[in-house]
């Protein structure tokens, strides 16, 4: 530590020893000590969060590392897979693959695997999403090789016994029933299904209940053959030197054989969308024309989802073994928009318990690689929102628009919060709200009012410098605080390399947030809620609404039809019709 300051002291001592002489013209003598210190400082210009490296192995596996020292290190394997790429034959396999992680392999029994995982300490898990399958672990530094070994075994060489498969299908059935009992869990699923009808991001994240009887070893193996290939893998390390990370990845994944099967397009540019657009447009127009009868319009979508009342599946001639095709892998997400309504909630058995109407309004958002994604994230933070009751008392988020303009102004609103889902080639942006029964139309009008206010140039509701500055600061602080978690840091590294091919430095992200202006946010708001996202899938620009109304004894309510909902949204100049 003392050596760091030695050159500065030498400079000070030498200057005191110099004799006093008259200044002469000519070049000044070079101070070697000061020059060396300056050069050393110039070399280390990167911040600790920018010390990332990426290496591609000979078989296509990408190895990414970020060497931030800590007591814990992280390792994760990220696979280009997920529900958006599933065809009818493997529908729901992502969910079951998630459940089958860290079970028996050719070298360990399920009990031995569990025992080894428990000895590691820390956190080891598997999670599936619409666009990725993630195996992650945060553990002690010395246990990283063991964690990589366990991941390699469960990814490359699982036994997939009938007993394990049957057990996880039963667990999935319980999860399906559980999610239907919670509106905050099922409604986001339904929003995706209505927004991307019959394609890609509209595929259910969990296994449909009627599909559970068809999930077998052959379905799982078909899924693995399509996605578990070296060119689809990113192995990420946090807190591990890059040379060590590459050696571990080479040891456990370097001998995977590359496949000649079609690759994954992250933009959808490899496939013409003409046929897709025409097909989806027909489906969208049919939905729009018949959706005034809510039970009729929602039946098709609900039958594809994990309905709690789904009957036992009957043999389907179309569910023969069909490998994942090039079209399945490269099809862009086509936003259709639409309306979906759930059966009304019955009055609670306990009259003292409240019941609420739930409504979600969404528009096509932006792809994660879009230049305007930072502005859209700032708009979500600016809208903010939450619930009418805060366990911690007044505090964070109380100055967001949905708090000040909605929750604080309308006592019949239970919750109101903005959401923003971003994917590789599309997204969803909107507001989710819950209100007292009989207030559905006023609630929809309030939601439309707040979204429309983001686009206005003048007036009291127009965006202001102060609130935009506050939202930018909140977004930056949230980003930085989240990255303090080793697991979040690890997932951020792995997913960014998977999507962008590189790690975007935190300094770059915070700079781009800080550079945003009121005009930028207003322009992006007009683009998104105006139905002009213009993503690769050539979306319709129509709004998406998912509704579940509540009933109360003694209160008569009139169900809203799709035409009335569209008229209300159009009055606020939102979306396209």
Curated annotation (Swiss-Prot):
UniProt keyword Membrane present: no
Claim: Zinc is one of the keywords in the record: no
Gene3D superfamilies: Metalloenzyme, LuxS/M16 peptidase-like (3.30.830.10)
Signal peptide (UniProt feature, chain positions): none
UniProt keyword list: Mitochondrion, Transit peptide
Subcellular location field: Mitochondrion matrix
Molecular function GO terms recorded: metal ion binding; metalloendopeptidase activity
Matches recorded under InterPro entries: Metalloenz_LuxS/M16 (IPR011249), MPP/UQCRC_Complex (IPR050361), Pept_M16_N (IPR011765), Pept_M16_Zn_BS (IPR001431), Peptidase_M16_C (IPR007863)
Superkingdom of the organism of origin: Eukaryota
Cellular component annotations (GO), alphabetically ordered: mitochondrial matrix; mitochondrion
Region (Disordered): 259-301
Residue span of the annotated presequence: 1-35
Primary subcellular site in the record, as a coarse category: mitochondrion
Bias (Low complexity) ranges: 269-301
PANTHER family cross-referenced by the UniProt entry: METALLOPROTEASE, MITOCHONDRIAL-PROCESSING PEPTIDASE SUBUNIT ALPHA
Function: Substrate recognition and binding subunit of the essential mitochondrial processing protease (MPP), which cleaves the mitochondrial sequence off newly imported precursors proteins.
Entry comment, domain topic: Appears to contain two domains of approximately equal size which are separated by a loop-like sequence.
Binding partners and assembly: Heterodimer of mpp (alpha) and pep (beta) subunits, forming the mitochondrial processing protease (MPP) in which mpp is involved in substrate recognition and binding and pep is the catalytic subunit.
The name this protein goes by in its record: Mitochondrial-processing peptidase subunit alpha
Lineage: Eukaryota, Fungi, Dikarya, Ascomycota, Pezizomycotina
